[in-house]
Amino acid sequence: MSSSAVSPKQWVAGLNSELDIPAVNRRTSIICTIGPKSNNVETLCKLRDAGMNIVRMNFSHGSYEYHQSVIDNARKASATNPLFPLAIALDTKGPEIRTGLTVGGTDYPISSGHEMIFTTDDAYAEKCNDKVMYIDYKNITKVIQPGRIIYVDDGILSFTVIEKVDDKNLKVRVNNNGKISSKKGVNLPKTDVDLPALSEKDKADLRFGVKNGVDMIFASFIRRAEDVIHIREVLGEEGKNIKIICKIENQQGVNNFDSILDVTDGIMVARGDLGIEIPASQVFVAQKMMIAKCNIAGKPVACATQMLESMTYNPRPTRAEVSDVGNAVLDGADLVMLSGETTKGSYPVEAVTYMAETARVAEASIPYGSLYQEMFGLVRRPLECATETTAVAAIGASIESDAKAIVVLSTSGNTARLCSKYRPSIPIVMVTRCPQRARQSHLNRGVYPVIYEKEPLSDWQKDVDARVAYGCQQAYKMNILKKGDKIIVLQGAVGGKGHTSIFRLTVAE
């Protein structure tokens, strides 16, 4: 029985834990954060071979010299196997609130019930102790109300605001035992803050990214649509093709999600800070909501933070972690991410291997027929975009014809993205002359980029046929196609950039 003929619950009830996973390529992309332990060509090649698609640089740490070495090593690793181009992502530090320095670098123990002062007075920036703690957000006394909670050090310390003493000082009560230390992060849940989208450091980091031709920006602590517009302005003309992926990690970002989604290229569900800003028990609800809205909009969405965290030190993940990865894929995530597992972990390659295999199992458990019908039913008609109309029709034809792949000839990557939106059960092979667009296509589930380097032929149709043939040749090497398989080809009607308006059924030769 086809998946479109049964309800979602019936489909799940029919799954088998001894599922025979077909020998298909994984469709969900994997982001790996690179740290000193993994920043070498040999390890990067191993990570790629295990399943890494995107190299992430965390600009909360490291010098420009270090990040330059990551870029250089990633490109060297990518060049060893052009069949699998690696994308490079720059993750901004973003606007943060931090405590000051303690006197002499000493840690000061504090107990539940203890009362102290939080101050924005610069005189205490390097004189924090168990009586006064400096906060570097000048407007904290203006935005926070008595009774609100302030978290410090990733939520390890919790304080309740008792009263506003004056324009620079808050009186707070300690909610749990702990210690006051230097330069710890501060979170203000349920409080709207007016921090700028980009610090001066972030702006310099973005310029570094533009100079080095990074493929995408993971923009931290995005709170409103205007933040995205500001980032685009800083990237400027030279960086206009860099994709912006907004990290949602606070209540403001969740509240303004729809307007952010309208202007961004994609979303990352950043569950670390989000789980401090909103109750941890509500994070999975926010995750499902954001993934669903991204799927409906046809924009890529990544799920991140603590996915296989135990593998930082252990050779095998916990069962809960594996379920977390699998369920993120079932929710509809286009990408899943590793952080400490690959920056400092003892088992980085094993972590990627587990993540890749779990994603493949989850993908094999999806009722593609009913999913396509559901996505098609959610589209507002008539479709305003000719390319999307063609993509929808092509996927429908692929189902009826039992085609084995969709070959997309693309300049911008937009057609492949729109095909991915409808979650076809077969791979999308994107053939493009633009290496950056090829690398960026890793943002979309089920898209396999092929870089075609030959110059255009004067005869448009001959050039089309040459690109299709090359795409099929590369698909053979990726074990996506066999000669004689039916394929759907999507192309434009004329040369150059424009709408994709033609699809045809043919045979891979």
From Swiss-Prot:
Pathway note: Carbohydrate degradation; glycolysis; pyruvate from D-glyceraldehyde 3-phosphate: step 5/5
Reaction catalyzed: pyruvate + ATP = phosphoenolpyruvate + ADP + H(+)
Binding, K(+): N58, S60, D91, T92
Site (Transition state stabilizer): K247
Domain of life according to the entry: Eukaryota
Binding site for substrate: R56, G272, D273, T305
Residues that bear Phosphoserine: S29, S63, S281, S412
InterPro entries: Pyr_Knase, Pyrv/PenolPyrv_kinase-like_dom, Pyrv_kinase-like_dom_sf, Pyrv_Knase-like_insert_dom_sf, Pyrv_Knase_AS, Pyrv_Knase_brl, Pyrv_Knase_C, Pyrv_Knase_C_sf
Statement: the UniProt record of this protein carries the keyword DNA-binding: no
Binding site for Mg(2+): E249, D273
Gene Ontology molecular-function annotations: ATP binding; kinase activity; magnesium ion binding; potassium ion binding; pyruvate kinase activity
Reported cofactor(s): Mg(2+); K(+)
EC class of the enzyme, as a word: transferase
Binding site for ATP: N58, F59, S60, H61, R98, K184
GO cellular component: cytoplasm; cytosol
Keyword Zinc-finger: no
E.C. no: 2.7.1.40
Keywords: ATP-binding, Glycolysis, Kinase, Magnesium, Metal-binding, Nucleotide-binding, Phosphoprotein, Potassium, Pyruvate, Transferase
Biological process, per Gene Ontology: canonical glycolysis; glycolytic process
Subunit structure: Homotetramer.
Similarity comment: Belongs to the pyruvate kinase family.
Protein known as: Pyruvate kinase
Organism, as annotated: Schizosaccharomyces pombe (strain 972 / ATCC 24843)
